[in-house]
Amino acid sequence: MTERMILKVDHTGIDKPLLWTAILLALAGLVMVSSASLQIAETRLGDPFYYAMRHGIYLALGLGVGAFVYYAVPLALLERLRFVMLPVALVALVMVFIPGLGRTVNGSTRWIALPGLTIQASEIVKLCFVLYLAGYVAQRKAALETEWKAFLLPLGLLGVLMLLLLLEPDFGAVVVLGITAMGMLFLSGVPTLRFLLIGLIAVALGGLVAFAEPYRVARLMTFTDPWADQFGSGYQLTQSLIAFGRGHWFGVGLGNSVQKLFYLPEAHTDFVYAVMSEELGLLGNVALIGGFILLGWRVFRIGHRLEARGLLYHAYLVYGCAFVFCSQAFINLGVNMGLLPTKGLTLPFISYGGSSLLISAVMVGLILRAGAEADHLKARGRAAR
């Protein structure tokens, strides 16, 4: 690669609070996955550290991939390749429906099974769509503020991706993708009235989707009163709430959770936050939420600074990553606490899952790269004067 392809950046200007927040969240995730998965790993696989070791490997790979993205992937190259991102996302979604490639877990076909590797298609879709939409907004920002066509085009493409996600089904990914897209378009300056109209349509369609499948209706009914069927459809949520109740202020101690002993399903994946709350109590609970608030604030701050400097692609790429992190964390935490219906979403950096951890690491690398490139360009401008 030439120097033009790899833009030199000032690595001393890296956003250290963001970097360390992401690292600490990932390390906390490793600890909690290790604790929450001991019994289930020993029972299912005969090795209590199976999931912990795999998660550690994913974390190491994530650090390596994130570092590579930060040091060696110029955002100008990604901006030029933005039109490739949608075909990549579509291919990933179609692959889950190919016999022999798609893997079904708990009734959902969301994974691509490759030799020695399983990839969750929706994680690829989130990243690819953010990369595409950031480039679209950077090129069409003025048109987005005035033209319906410019606003509806990305929504139409989004609808295709959502349809394929619903066929898996993966309603949680649909919600995250929708929030991310609408958030990025809103920040681009699309008039509020258009959002209200689209919002009404989205709510109506969301209602139809929610009531089209019996299992979604059951989830909604369970969400309103999980104790009405605590040994049936409300079992997972009631066990999660029991975990929160047992935690009190300071928890029962790391490794001492009772709910992870086959009472709480998905204790090391979607509901690891409940186990964390049981073992570390309200103190650990608040610390984790504070970590995500700090992460979101730093990322949005970087995006705002980039937009103020006129680096629109950089800014909206960062905004998109921020919406993915914040919406997914908010939904997962809300589901664990019984504030939202069950969605089947992992908690970024914390839950067990290689695809989620790797894509999160890539996004952090892109965010840090965007900030570093902006600092380099600013310093080069001062030197030129």
Curated annotation (Swiss-Prot):
Name the UniProt key words of this record, in alphabetical order. Cell cycle, Cell division, Cell inner membrane, Cell membrane, Cell shape, Cell wall biogenesis/degradation, Glycosyltransferase, Membrane, Peptidoglycan synthesis, Transferase, Transmembrane, Transmembrane helix
Bilayer topology term: Multi-pass membrane protein
Tell me, in one coarse class, where this protein mainly resides: membrane
> Which leading EC class covers this enzyme?
transferase
> What GO biological process term is on the record, naming one?
peptidoglycan biosynthetic process
Note the InterPro entries from the entry: Cell_cycle_FtsW-rel_CS (IPR018365), FtsW (IPR013437), FtsW/RodA (IPR001182)
User: Which reaction(s) does its UniProt entry say it catalyses?
Assistant: [GlcNAc-(1->4)-Mur2Ac(oyl-L-Ala-gamma-D-Glu-L-Lys-D-Ala-D-Ala)](n)-di-trans,octa-cis-undecaprenyl diphosphate + beta-D-GlcNAc-(1->4)-Mur2Ac(oyl-L-Ala-gamma-D-Glu-L-Lys-D-Ala-D-Ala)-di-trans,octa-cis-undecaprenyl diphosphate = [GlcNAc-(1->4)-Mur2Ac(oyl-L-Ala-gamma-D-Glu-L-Lys-D-Ala-D-Ala)](n+1)-di-trans,octa-cis-undecaprenyl diphosphate + di-trans,octa-cis-undecaprenyl diphosphate + H(+)
User: Which GO molecular-function terms appear in the entry?
Assistant: lipid-linked peptidoglycan transporter activity; peptidoglycan glycosyltransferase activity
One Pfam family linked to the record:
FTSW_RODA_SPOVE
Bilayer-crossing regions: 18-38, 57-77, 81-101, 111-131, 157-177, 195-215, 280-300, 311-331, 347-367
Q: What is its EC number?
A: 2.4.99.28
Where found, per UniProt?
Answer: Cell inner membrane
Q: Which GO terms describe its cellular component?
A: cell division site; plasma membrane
Pathway-wise, it operates in: Cell wall biogenesis; peptidoglycan biosynthesis
Q: Which family does it belong to?
A: Belongs to the SEDS family. FtsW subfamily.
Protein purpose: Peptidoglycan polymerase that is essential for cell division.
Supply the NCBIfam families for this chain: ftsW
What this protein is called in its record is Probable peptidoglycan glycosyltransferase FtsW
